[in-house]
Structures are given as structure tokens and as C-alpha cells.
């Protein structure tokens, strides 16, 4: 929903892929997934469908965790509506610096908005809880290392380390950036092994 220049799911997010369904049908899909043994209800980039999702979820609780899988650019007001409905938050923290946020996502306020959103997510869930190797509640912050943007990655790592204590949240440092058709400048190449290793060393 940010239309990032490096979006890995452009067909879905920007080309109208999908079909309309009602909140009633969405609830039926949730129920079918649970009956089939799904470990969670994973809602991917659901923010612009918040009203429909909340209607479909009802008052709950569901027998499996409800997962809010998002890009991090969320409003605190919307997140507050999800309290006690969502057990697991999977936000991206794409940027901690304004310059790449503006250049690649047209959202200079992304760092401020995403940090506030993640703090609200953590307020709701508290420290993460694992059960039989599965995340049952909590916040898992993801960060995709971008080519030539190691300083941004370091700033993300710094904020997470300074904001949370060990055991509060999970953090995933991702390396799978793939240049999209028409990518230019820094985004025209993959992340090098040296860049990713440097990010790992900094995180350690």
C-alpha cells in the first residue's frame, strides 16, 4: 500500500490482482482455514480492509493466532482498533532514515510513523511468547537490507536495540532483495554478501 519502488509483490499490490469478497465470506474462509489445520490466520497487508477484517473476525477469540502482517506504515488509531483481536504483529521496519524513505516509498514520515506503530503493537502484545516453536503472541520486526543503504540498516538496528530489551520482540534481518523491472540507481542490483555480512556483524 506504499507502492515502494522495490516491492516484491507488485502484481498483487499494484495491479489489482484478486477478487472481491464480503466480510461474511471472509469469515467463512477463516473458519475453513482453521478446520484445515492452519497454524494462524495470516492477514497480509490488510490495513486498507480493516473494517471488513474486524467484521469478519467478530469478537473472537479464535483458536489460532490472528497475525497482522504489514509494512509498518500504520496509524496508531487503526492499531488500537485491533487490540484483543490480533495476537501477532509482523511489521516491516523498512527505514529509520528519512532520505531513503522519501526516495523509495515517497513517505518521508515513514520512520516516525512506523516506530510509533511498532510501539503501539508492543503495548498491546507485550513480550513475545513461543509455544512448540511457534509464535503465539508478540511482535516480530522485519527489515529488508537494501543495496547501498547500510547506514539505514544500521539505524534500524540501533533503534530496535535501544528501544526494546532482550525477550521483548523478535527481529528478522532479511537479504532477499530482488531488483524489479525498470529498477534504477542503487536498486538496480542485489545486496552483496559483503553488505549483508556487514549488517549481521553490526547487529551482533
Over which residues does each language-model region extend?
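Acceptor-substrate binding/catalytic loop of class I
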Residues: 186-191
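Electropositive phosphate-/nucleotide-binding environments in soluble metabolic enzymes
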Residues: 20-23, 150, 154, 193
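Canonical Radical SAM [4Fe-4S] cluster-binding loop centered on the CxxxCxxC motif
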Residues: 1-20
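Short cysteine/histidine-rich metal-coordination sites, predominantly Zn2+-binding motifs
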Residues: 17-29
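Conserved AdoMet/S-adenosylmethionine-binding subsite of the radical SAM
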Residues: 30-185
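A cross-taxonomic marker for long C-terminal extensions/tails that follow the last structured domain
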Residues: 194-204
